[in-house]
Design a protein with these regions (language model features):
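Long, charged, low-complexity intrinsically disordered regions
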Residues: 1-95
Length: 95
């Protein structure tokens, strides 16, 4: 696959970042949040992994600035613990 080709992701409330390069994450997370909210999916789980925490910090930085994000927190142990973030969205404004 060409690096410039778009990848289509299922918008189902869970975004697993393990297969993406770090430089893709900022735009990917913001776009995923927009599309999920547009489809009425207002609770998300973003899997960033445990690793060094760099990816988690990047994801949290994007979420902090996103206008549709109401709140976010690390997942409970049964949902991935500190390797995943749970996100609550507000519906997008219409009109």
């Amino acid at each position: 696959m060409n690096a410039d080709e778009a990848v289509e992701l299922p918008i189902d409330g869970e975004l697993d970042l393990h297969t993406f390069a770090p430089h893709e994450v900022k735009e990917l997370v913001a776009s995923y949040v927009d599309e999920a909210a547009e489809r009425g999916i207002l609770e998300l789980r973003i899997v960033h992994g445990k690793g060094t925490g760099a990816l988690k910090r990047l994801v949290h930085a994007v979420l902090e600035r996103h206008e549709l994000v109401v709140a976010f927190r690390l997942a409970d142990e049964g949902q991935g613990g500190w390797g995943a973030t749970l996100v609550q969205l507000r519906p997008p404004r219409r009109g």
